[in-house]
């Protein structure tokens, strides 16, 4: 029975992990940080946004690192997913402790956007790098392979036309995001009802919020919305979506649902990020769309969907995006994007894990 140490801190990483586990034998045992049993910590305990938040939780993060390194002694291999600021140093410490321990990194950091030196660190400390973007492989020397994109495993239904019945609102999965984005989305929903007439409004809530007091998280205005824990189903049924940046933007693009990306960070965090990251776009769909059109990812001229970021974000801007988006063009180009990513990744990653464990 192989034991796998997992570090999956993000909601999206845990969705990808769940799909991966369906492609693995049932006798694989998982330990570490993820949504499931035998966990050291829940990913919810790592819900940190911004540079100040990291400094405030530094003691906890160092403690978690130390415990994960110790836990690695029990594991036959290590699976690291996304969250490079936590996982790259973790890989280094585990490899120093046991140079023969096999480490796989699945969902690579965005070295094409910033901190390109991380590519060398990953190749030094990891044994296999699973790239989920075709253009990522070019940033590595030898250990990276394009394995497909996990969303193409997880999404079960794709739109056949641009029609939809609902408006979907996705204000993020972190409390700080929700606090900033949800009030804007509420105002946009109310203005749309005044201007366009009533349409069903669906609020997509992260699945790990089940059992929590949603009114305490979102406020009294949550009663204006239908609640859904199924992002893919809700996006498939939607006419249009209002989405905080993140994996959900790519999910909408692959499903074929028109949307606007909306994001507002703390001013200091935004200014620091601007100094470190040189990108025109922050939306994954726009970044991939640049690559699809042979442009530098995140810096190209082509745009699949509108982005409203920081001081450009307003209720009026959200309404304008809803009214003016060329939905037929968007739908046609979203099909091209799906073809670009080709196929899912779970089966390939499962096979590579078996290889690292000497089971093939």
Swiss-Prot record:
Pathway annotation: Bacterial outer membrane biogenesis; LPS lipid A biosynthesis
The entry's keywords: Glycosyltransferase, Lipid A biosynthesis, Lipid biosynthesis, Lipid metabolism, Transferase
Gene Ontology cellular-component annotations: membrane
Enzyme class: transferase
Any one GO molecular function term: lipid-A-disaccharide synthase activity
GO biological process terms on file: lipid A biosynthetic process
Entries under Pfam families matching the protein: LpxB
EC number: 2.4.1.182
SUPFAM superfamilies linked: UDP-Glycosyltransferase/glycogen phosphorylase
InterPro entries (UniProt xref): Glyco_trans_19
Catalysis: reaction(s): a lipid X + a UDP-2-N,3-O-bis[(3R)-3-hydroxyacyl]-alpha-D-glucosamine = a lipid A disaccharide + UDP + H(+)
Function: Condensation of UDP-2,3-diacylglucosamine and 2,3-diacylglucosamine-1-phosphate to form lipid A disaccharide, a precursor of lipid A, a phosphorylated glycolipid that anchors the lipopolysaccharide to the outer membrane of the cell.
Family designation: Belongs to the LpxB family.
Protein name per the record: Lipid-A-disaccharide synthase
Designated gene of the protein: lpxB
């Amino acid at each position: 029975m192989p034991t796998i140490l997992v570090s999956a801190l993000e909601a999206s990483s845990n969705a990808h992990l769940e799909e991966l586990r369906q492609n693995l034998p049932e006798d694989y045992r998982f330990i570490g940080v993820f949504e499931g049993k035998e966990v050291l910590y829940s990913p919810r305990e790592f819900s940190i946004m911004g540079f100040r938040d990291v400094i405030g939780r530094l003691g906890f993060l160092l403690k978690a690192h130390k415990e994960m390194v110790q836990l690695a002694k029990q594991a036959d291999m290590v699976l690291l997913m996304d969250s490079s600021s936590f996982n790259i140093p973790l890989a280094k410490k585990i490899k120093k402790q046991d140079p023969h321990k096999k480490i796989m990194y699945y969902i690579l950091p965005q070295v094409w956007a910033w901190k390109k030196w991380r590519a060398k660190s990953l190749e030094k400390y990891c044994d296999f790098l699973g790239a989920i973007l075709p253009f990522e492989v070019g940033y590595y020397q030898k250990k990276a392979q394009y394995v497909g994109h996990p969303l193409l495993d997880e999404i079960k239904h794709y739109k056949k036309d641009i029609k939809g019945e609902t408006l979907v609102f996705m204000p993020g999965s972190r409390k700080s995001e929700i606090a900033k984005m949800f009030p804007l989305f509420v105002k946009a929903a109310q203005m749309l009802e005044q201007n366009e007439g009533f349409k069903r409004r669906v609020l997509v809530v992260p699945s790990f919020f089940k059992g929590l007091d949603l009114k305490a998280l979102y406020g009294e205005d949550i009663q204006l919305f239908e609640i859904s824990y199924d992002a893919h189903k809700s996006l498939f049924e939607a006419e249009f979506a209002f989405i905080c940046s993140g994996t959900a933007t790519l999910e909408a693009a692959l499903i074929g649902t028109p949307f606007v990306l909306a994001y507002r960070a703390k001013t200091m965090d935004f200014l620091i990020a601007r100094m470190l990251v040189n990108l025109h776009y922050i939306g994954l769909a726009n970044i991939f769309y640049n690559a699809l059109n042979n442009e530098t990812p995140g810096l190209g001229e082509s745009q699949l969907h509108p982005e409203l970021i920081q001081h450009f974000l307003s209720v009026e801007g959200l309404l304008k995006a809803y009214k003016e988006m060329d939905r037929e063009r968007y739908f046609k180009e979203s099909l091209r994007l799906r073809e670009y990513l080709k196929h899912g990744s779970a089966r390939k990653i499962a096979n590579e894990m078996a290889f690292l464990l000497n089971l093939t």
